[in-house]
UniProtKB/Swiss-Prot annotation:
Pathway membership: Carbohydrate metabolism; tricarboxylic acid cycle; isocitrate from oxaloacetate: step 1/2
Name this protein carries in UniProt: Citrate synthase
Reaction equations catalysed: oxaloacetate + acetyl-CoA + H2O = citrate + CoA + H(+)
Gene Ontology biological-process entries: tricarboxylic acid cycle
Top EC class of this enzyme: transferase
Keywords associated with the record: Allosteric enzyme, Transferase, Tricarboxylic acid cycle
Additional notes on this entry: Citrate synthase is found in nearly all cells capable of oxidative metabolism.
Length: 20
């Protein structure tokens, strides 16, 4: 599936797509 992953950490966040 085509999903969005968001990593949250100290100064902000980073999002990236993942293909499962």
């Amino acid at each position: 599936s085509d999903n969005s992953v968001v990593l949250r950490y100290g100064d902000g966040e980073y999002s990236y797509p993942v293909v499962d």
